[in-house]
Design a protein with these regions (language model features):
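Active-site microenvironment of metallo-dependent hydrolases
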Residues: 160-176, 180-461
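Divalent-metal coordination cores built from histidine and acidic residues
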Residues: 1-76, 142, 385-388
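Short beta-strand/turn micro-motifs composed of small residues
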Residues: 16, 83, 318
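Alpha-helix boundary recognition
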Residues: 6, 41-42, 73, 95, ...
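A structural signal for isolated positions on well-ordered beta-strands in alpha/beta enzyme cores
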Residues: 11-13, 80, 148, 377
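Active-site core of metal-dependent hydrolases
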Residues: 47-186, 191-201, 210-215, 220-234, ...
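Residue-level marker for buried hydrophobic side chains located in beta-strands
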Residues: 14, 149, 355-358
Length: 461
């Protein structure tokens, strides 16, 4: 990625992955220790250590985590945080370890506590996680000098239609924020935070990376300059970069699925009991809640599924080492009334996640993604209704953003027609259900994870 982004009409910087796997209760395709990361700090476009999501291990002085922090600090680079709802003494310990920012704040009191303790706050407004409205009081002095704008995950269609940071600035201005403050939070503050001393402002001695706007209300970008040269106008690149794909050199990336075909037997619940634990989604957020309900069985659906109560079955299949590990659980508020959805985008280990109302469609959707070596799929009544192959590591496509968006919208439309909740993104929200560092419950290949306690809890009991 460093190599292929060298000569673009865009400055691309990187933060090193700090937690692969996210915690000890996760199963990833690789394990990245401090020694593997250390050489990359010499790269000028590597700005530091990315979101330190294992806050549980950090505050308990995990030696491997502390070594990564020490290496990054010694290189004079930034350490980003990821610590939803961390507070009090544990937050103090986390910050004292060297973590300098956080992008997981969904409530104002949480952001204020972290600001008071010296962290920068990244105000997130993406596809699934939308926190700007809750954090609007930060868009003024004295807070705005320590706050910046970020998107986290965002669908290609949202980027094409609304934009990236410019979309958040536009939305903030519409909410009454001073345009100068909004622009500052989207440009100067992040450059100051990441140590990009000659970027982020139109001033003597600064790199001539700038945009020309229609006005400060609509905030329509009319021209883009890179190093003083006009590179885009009226929403189009003047000289688009040619896409080259060396499949021989990156064969491992294009063949990232190492798992056997899914069978119905893998979806059979091993646990028994009279109650079931449901991972309940939260509208426009990544947080989940826990709900305990009587174990349900209805004709035509898998045991534990109750479409009237918006409860579907959930499975995560390990896809990197052919271990055969499968975690099973139940997902609430997803809304799907029939069929099954599968995705190889499943943060952060990106195993294969499948949600559905019946085992047969779950098997079909999962095997469709496996056959395509990654991507998304929707199966209904034994037929594949739609699919989007993502052949680059099971996460990305070599097709244009426009082509990917067209296929994605067709999939999402089909899912909306079959019950997906209006305030839930069918794929983006699902992709975070397996990340065992955002409260309250997650599902990975080991089972349901209680994030706060960092332990596996039963789905049925």
């Amino acid at each position: 990625m460093l190599e292929t982004t060298k000569n673009l009409a865009l400055s691309v910087y990187f933060m090193l992955p700090s937690c692969v796997p996210a915690t000890g209760l996760d199963e990833s395709g690789a394990v990245l220790e401090a020694e593997q990361l250390r050489p990359y700090y010499q790269q000028p476009r590597v700005l530091g250590l990315a979101e330190l999501m294992n806050s549980y291990g950090t505050v308990r002085a995990d030696e491997k985590i502390l070594q990564k922090i020490c290496d990054c600090t010694a290189a004079g680079k930034r350490i980003d945080g990821h610590a939803p709802f961390l507070s009090g003494e544990e937050l103090n310990a986390y910050i004292a370890a060297g973590v300098q920012s956080d992008h997981e704040c969904s409530e104002l009191h949480e952001a204020m506590e972290k600001l008071r303790r010296g962290q920068y706050i990244m105000v997130r407004e993406g596809t699934a996680a939308q926190n700007m409205e809750s954090l609007l009081p930060l868009f003024r002095e004295p807070y705005c000098s320590r706050c910046m704008l970020v998107t986290d995950d965002k669908h290609p269609g949202d980027l094409l239609q609304g934009g990236h940071i410019d979309y958040i600035i536009r939305k903030a201005i519409a909410a009454g924020v001073d345009p100068v403050v909004a622009v500052r939070m989207g440009t100067l503050v992040p450059c100051q935070y990441f140590g990009l001393a000659h970027s982020g402002a139109v001033a003597p001695g600064y790199t001539a990376d700038l945009i020309v706007l229609s006005d400060l209300e609509q905030f329509t970008v009319e021209q883009v300059y890179k190093n003083g040269k006009l590179v885009a106008q009226q929403g189009r690149m003047l000289h688009p970069a040619a896409l080259t794909v060396d499949k021989a050199r990156f064969a491992r990336v294009f063949d990232s699925f190492n798992m056997d075909e899914i069978t119905p037997e893998q979806l059979q619940l091993k646990q028994t009991g009279t109650r079931q634990r449901v991972i309940c989604l939260t509208p426009h957020a990544l947080l989940t809640t826990e709900k305990i309900v009587p174990f349900c069985q209805h004709p035509g659906t898998a045991p534990g599924v109750d479409v009237a109560q918006k409860i579907v079955k959930l499975a995560v299949f390990e896809r990197h080492h052919r271990s055969g590990h499968v975690g099973l659980g139940f997902l609430g508020n997803y809304g799907l009334q029939c069929g099954a959805v599968a995705s190889s985008i499943a943060h952060d280990s990106h195993n294969l996640i499948v949600a559905g109302t019946n085992d047969a469609d779950m098997v079909l959707a999962g095997n469709t993604v496996r056959k395509n070596k990654g991507g998304l799929a929707f199966a209904l009544n034994g037929q594949v209704v739609g699919e989007l192959p993502l052949t680059v590591a099971g996460l990305m496509s070599t097709e244009s953003a426009e082509t990917v968006e067209e296929k994605l919208q067709a999939l999402k439309a089909a899912l909306k027609a079959h019950g997906i909740s209006e305030d839930i993104d069918a794929f983006m929200t699902l992709a975070f259900v397996s990340l065992p560092v955002i409260p309250k419950l997650r599902l990975n290949t080991y089972g349901i994870v209680d994030v706060d306690a960092q332990r596996i809890v039963p789905a049925v009991f």
